[in-house]
Regions:
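Short, surface-exposed, charged amphipathic helix/loop patches that serve as local interaction elements
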Residues: 1-158
Length: 158
């Protein structure tokens, strides 16, 4: 049955992004939370390129706009439910899905002394490992850590 849904999604120009592949690893989302990404329209790419700047606050606004326009969530969720730690990763997945090409970042390798590039994919991403002492404080129903009566979670966009 899942293959039929994947086929229908591909006809709609969208694909499901596994929540476990996100930087948050999905632990702060409700169990029924799902996320689909769509390919970006040419006019939005042109607008992004026209407005792109080295000002990080402008870049973040543009990234959030693209993510908001090109993600689909179940009806009981909104863009504001997406965790802020996942936004840039989702944006890069949208870029990869739209261009059908790898997203690579160039960097200088201090050990080898040469410039290299790395592909940004879940396999190359270092996920946060929750310390064992903190894992014991996690409430799976509320999706929060509870320490000394205080509740902690990663911030959402909203």
């Amino acid at each position: 049955m899942k293959n039929i849904f994947n086929w229908l999604d591909s006809l709609k120009g969208r694909k499901e992004l596994p929540i476990k592949s996100l930087p948050s690893q999905g632990i702060f989302y409700a169990n029924d939370f799902k996320l689909w990404i769509k390919k970006v329209k040419v006019e939005d790419i042109l607008e992004y390129e026209k407005l792109y700047t080295s000002d990080i606050s402008v870049v973040l606004v543009l990234i959030k706009k693209i993510v908001q326009l090109y993600t689909t969530l179940p009806s009981k969720y909104t863009f504001d439910d997406i965790k802020s730690t996942d936004i840039i990763f989702i944006f890069l997945e949208i870029v990869r899905f739209t261009t059908n090409r790898a997203v690579k970042i160039d960097y200088y390798n201090d050990i080898s002394g040469i410039s290299e590039s790395i592909e940004l994919v879940p396999d190359n991403f270092n996920y946060f490992d929750v310390p064992k002492a903190l894992k014991n404080t996690f409430n799976p129903e509320t999706k929060e850590f509870i320490v000394d009566g205080y509740k902690f979670s990663v911030p959402s966009i909203g």
